[in-house]
Amino acid sequence: MIPMDVVLIVLILVLVGYFSKIFGILKEEHAKILNNIVIYIAMPSTIFLTISKNVSSSQILEFLKLPVVIFLCCLFVGILAYLLGKHIFKLKDEKLGGLILVSMLGNTGFLGYPVALGMFGEEGLARAIFCDLGGVFATMLLGTYVGIRFGKGRDKSILKDMAKFPPLITGILSIILVFFGFKLNYIPSFILKSLNYLSSATVPLIMMSLGLSLSPKALKFGVFWGIIASIFRFIVSPATAFTLSELINIKGLEKNVLLVESSMPSAMMTLVLGTLYELDIKLIASSIFITTTFSLLVIALWGWILLN
């Protein structure tokens, strides 16, 4: 797909959600309902079908490099954000924890899937799903650690909930099935068609949910930390991914998808973590809005570099 087309499709679908909120068709709290439909129904269908169609057992070990690199990128960026916030900006714990989260965790699923699908087709989406597994584990382990270490809700944990996260479970089970030679033609056609219908809802619902969740009002909390987070998300993270891909010999489409996925804006999940652990919500909200807005330019740039 033409790079600019990818950006315009993403923008239009996000704006559908945003203007649905502006005109009172939907409310911001409806984003949670859409998210539940995506997480529990549509996205698992997409993950199962995409991995089953586009991944062979001989590719699995090569593809498993992708979540490892994404996880290491999150870890490295998190350490740098900690050093910057702690020793340069002298931030208090709540603000420091928020900065680490928005710098470290990228939106590899809710934005990464549509972008990878638009740029690289279903084969690219299959690789993006593997990348997102690394993002999920980073959220479970690193994100929870940051919340406990720098937040106030120290007795709370999302580890159990994340361990039951349907896309994660579906991804792991799909990989296991493919490894043992499972084929989609083993499934009755009416079930496959049903899964395809459910899967087709994933991208538009994700984008509409994103549009409902975005709020320009967050800019009143300041843009500085959003710019800092953008530097980490759009420069440091992909530079780290590129370096690691060279070291462990990731090439071709895997490398291209990895670079795009490592450049995703701050994850919406950071707001959940920030609320749960009582971190600086204003910093997190403004950073999500700013990095998501900038990401449209970054997506267009990656498309121009990788597809031309």
Curated annotation (Swiss-Prot):
It is a multi-pass membrane protein. GO terms for biological process: transmembrane transport. One of its GO terms (cellular component) is plasma membrane. It is found in: Cell membrane. InterPro entries: Auxin_eff_plant, Mem_transp_PIN-like, Na+/solute_symporter_sf. Signal peptide: none annotated. The chain crosses the membrane at residues 6-26, 31-51, 63-83, 100-120, 128-148, 162-182, 195-215, 221-241, 257-277, 287-307. Belongs to the auxin efflux carrier (TC 2.A.69) family. This is Uncharacterized transporter MJ1031. It comes from Methanocaldococcus jannaschii (strain ATCC 43067 / DSM 2661 / JAL-1 / JCM 10045 / NBRC 100440) (Methanococcus jannaschii). The lineage of its organism: Archaea, Methanobacteriati, Methanobacteriota, Methanomada group, Methanococci.
